[in-house]
């Protein structure tokens, strides 16, 4: 407010200058501690800043007062600064002057250093509040200087470069120019429908393969790509050499006159032909005969080799088909053995199965990308005899309601070898655990225990290889909790399932199983 009062109280340019000097002295004292920061900031100005347009080169309405003009560039002050001697300059102008002309004020030659300059925010506000005219030709808008840049960004009279010919046009006219006037606008060829630039269309028309052209000899109208064949084969008036030109006839005539020429010059043509044959007969032929004989022998050898190779290819094809059939049988046998081994391994679990889920980082990435992740474990038995079960792990998507970013874990019954001898529905206790793989003495596994509910479809005897109904936890564990400890090691997650079955002994006896005696002597 002191600066505002100082400006308003000065009635002349001299008093204004005196006021500014006083203000500069007070500001210099008040900002003494900040002069180092100001010096560093001023000293680090880039060369690109120094080369920018200094003052505001715009038309003011009313005209700009002289007190807002930079004495160096004679334009409106941009980023106005004051000197201790009370003069105002554009920041870029005065810094350039100090660096080029020496440390002195351009107006009164007083000693002036860069760190003595200070921003004139009052003048800056005043100048930005002045009314200016839009510099674009044809635009009548007036606005405060502070709004000029925003106006020019949307002004319909601003110049923009045509994206096709790169010439500048006013924004409101650019669309019409692009569609109707631009020499590089795309137009379609009337003959081949190809898109070409308007200024290149004349050249294209002169070379278009589908353009209609007139034969220069017979005036027939054809498309350009047909013309060479027309000249060589069909044109009746095209000049062609005599058929006997190879034998010495140098006459040329129109194609429709060739028959008459051959008829009228039969004797001379025969003499030329006889002379050519006679000259050939004088050439020794022993070399040619031997060469032809060599070619014949080579051809005979190649034909024999071709026949042998054809037989070999047929034999190899038959062997390959036999081997392919054998390999297919071996693959089926391997799959059968693998299934049997997996079944035997599943029977050895005795109700405790540890499921190793590899490449778990890939599954987490799919979950983050909102791709469904559902994984089933191999089957395992609760004992021998026992029920066959498997686990299902589901990574809930971030957008799922009430269970977003949770691990869901379920148990499914499967068709097993002993199903006909076991009591149904399944009864027992299931303990699901995600194992802590840290090296700590006491590991903090994440565990849940559930009891089977015989009335649910999930525990009835399955009628297909895997019961579609499962039993477990939709919100077994949050993914954030999974990352807090070492549940994932070597990109592998370990899930443990421990099953304790409760058999109805009467049912077991009816199914043909007898309970093992506790007597150690048996």
From Swiss-Prot:
SUPFAM superfamilies: RING/U-box (SSF57850), TRAF domain-like (SSF49599). It is found in: Cytoplasm; Cytoplasm, Cell cortex; Nucleus; Lipid droplet. Sumoylated on Lys-124, Lys-142 and Lys-453 with SUMO1. Its main location: cytoplasm. It is an enzyme of class 2 (transferase). GO terms for biological process: antigen processing and presentation of exogenous peptide antigen via MHC class II; antiviral innate immune response; autophagosome assembly; bone resorption; canonical NF-kappaB signal transduction; CD40 signaling pathway; cytoplasmic pattern recognition receptor signaling pathway; DNA damage response. There is a cross-link at residues 124, 142, 453 (Glycyl lysine isopeptide (Lys-Gly) (interchain with G-Cter in SUMO)). GO terms for cellular component: CD40 receptor complex; cell cortex; cytoplasmic side of plasma membrane; cytosol; glutamatergic synapse; lipid droplet; nucleus; perinuclear region of cytoplasm. A zinc finger (RING-type) spans 70-109. Gene3D superfamilies: Apoptosis, Tumor Necrosis Factor Receptor Associated Protein 2, Chain A, Zinc/RING finger domain, C3HC4 (zinc finger). Pathway: Protein modification; protein ubiquitination. Belongs to the TNF receptor-associated factor family. A subfamily. Homotrimer. Homooligomer. N-terminal region is dimeric while C-terminal region is trimeric; maybe providing a mode of oligomerization. Upon IL1B treatment, forms a complex with PELI1, IRAK1, IRAK4 and MYD88; this complex recruits MAP3K7/TAK1, TAB1 and TAB2 to mediate NF-kappa-B activation. Direct binding of SMAD6 to PELI1 prevents the complex formation and hence negatively regulates IL1R-TLR signaling and eventually NF-kappa-B-mediated gene expression. Binds to TNFRSF5/CD40 and TNFRSF11A/RANK. E3 ubiquitin ligase that, together with UBE2N and UBE2V1, mediates the synthesis of 'Lys-63'-linked-polyubiquitin chains conjugated to proteins, such as ECSIT, IKBKG, IRAK1, AKT1 and AKT2. Also mediates ubiquitination of free/unanchored polyubiquitin chain that leads to MAP3K7 activation. Leads to the activation of NF-kappa-B and JUN. Seems to also play a role in dendritic cells (DCs) maturation and/or activation. Represses c-Myb-mediated transactivation, in B-lymphocytes. The coiled coil domain mediates homo- and hetero-oligomerization. This is TNF receptor-associated factor 6.
């Amino acid at each position: 407010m002191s600066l505002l009062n100082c400006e308003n109280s000065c009635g002349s340019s001299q008093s204004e200058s005196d006021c500014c000097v006083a203000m500069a002295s007070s500001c210099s004292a008040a900002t003494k501690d900040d002069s180092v920061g100001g010096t560093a900031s001023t000293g680090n100005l880039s060369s690109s800043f120094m080369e920018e347009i200094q003052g505001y080169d715009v038309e003011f309405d009313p005209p700009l007062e002289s007190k807002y003009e930079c004495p160096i560039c004679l334009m409106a002050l941009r980023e106005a600064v004051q000197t201790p001697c009370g003069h105002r300059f554009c920041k870029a102008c005065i810094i350039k002057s100090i660096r080029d002309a020496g440390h002195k004020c351009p107006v009164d030659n007083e000693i002036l250093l860069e760190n003595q300059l200070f921003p004139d925010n009052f003048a800056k506000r005043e100048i930005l509040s002045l009314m200016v005219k839009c510099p674009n030709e044809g635009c009548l808008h007036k606005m405060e200087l502070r709004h000029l840049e925003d106006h020019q960004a949307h002004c319909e009279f601003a110049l923009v470069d045509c994206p096709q010919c790169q010439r500048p046009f006013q924004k409101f006219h650019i669309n019409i120019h692009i569609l109707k006037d631009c020499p590089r606008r795309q137009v379609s060829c009337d003959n081949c429908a190809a898109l070409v630039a308007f200024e290149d269309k004349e050249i294209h028309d002169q070379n278009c393969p589908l353009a209609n052209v007139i034969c220069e000899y017979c005036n027939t109208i054809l498309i350009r790509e047909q013309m060479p064949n027309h000249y060589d084969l069909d044109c009746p008036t095209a000049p062609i050499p005599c058929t006997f030109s190879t034998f010495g006839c140098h006459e040329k005539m129109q194609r429709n006159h060739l028959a008459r020429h051959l008829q009228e010059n039969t004797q001379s043509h025969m003499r030329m032909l006889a002379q050519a044959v006679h000259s050939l007969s004088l050439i020794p032929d022993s070399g040619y005969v031997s060469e032809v004989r060599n070619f014949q022998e080579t051809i005979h050898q190649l034909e024999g080799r071709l026949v042998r190779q054809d037989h070999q290819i047929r034999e190899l094809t038959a062997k390959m088909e036999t081997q392919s059939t054998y390999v297919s049988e071996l693959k089926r046998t391997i799959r059968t053995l693998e299934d049997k081994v997996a079944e035997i391994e599943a029977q050895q679990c005795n109700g405790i199965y540890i499921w190793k889920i590899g490449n778990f980082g890939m599954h987490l990435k799919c979950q983050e990308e909102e791709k469904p992740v559902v994984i089933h474990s191999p089957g395992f038995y609760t004992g021998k005899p026992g029920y066959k079960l498997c686990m299902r792990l589901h990574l809930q998507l971030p957008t799922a309601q009430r269970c977003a970013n949770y691990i869901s874990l379920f148990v499914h019954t499967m068709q097993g070898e002993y199903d006909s001898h076991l009591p149904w529905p399944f009864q027992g206790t299931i303990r699901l655990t995600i194992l802590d793989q840290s090296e700590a003495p006491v590991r903090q596994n994440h565990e849940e225990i559930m009891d089977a509910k015989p009335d649910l479809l999930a525990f009835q005897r399955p009628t297909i290889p895997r019961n579609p109904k499962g039993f477990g936890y939709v919100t077994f564990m949050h993914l954030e909790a999974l990352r807090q400890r070492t549940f994932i090691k070597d990109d592998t997650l370990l899930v443990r399932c421990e099953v304790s079955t409760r058999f109805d002994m009467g049912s077991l006896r009816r199914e043909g199983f007898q309970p093992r005696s506790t007597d150690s002597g048996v």
